[in-house]
Amino acid sequence: MWILTTVGFFSVVQKRGDSFLTVRARIASDLDHLRKEYMPELSETVTGQGTDYPYRATISHEKFTSGMVKLMRDIRHSNFKNEVSKKMGGKREKVYSKACNDLRALEGLTKGT
């Protein structure tokens, strides 16, 4: 699952054989922000390992869910991109905006295409 937030961009998966989630990021500080603000139980960040996402940490399903609930309860903004720009800077907002624009290609697709 991809998650774009005002504290970072994450890819969350459960790897085969694991009972916990792996939270992956392209920027190490995104995991630091997530850990500091919403998920103190998130493991230390592991760097590298020759994978698509250079930074990763692990957490239980339950603690991840609790952290996401906290993050959702903190939503007070009326414009996501403006809040991203305010909290994370204009460069991050531009990357998020490009992703949003690219996802517009989904409009008009039918189920299964």
Annotate each language-model stretch with its function.
Residues M1-T113:
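Structured alpha/beta or helical-core interaction and ligand-binding surfaces enriched in interleaved
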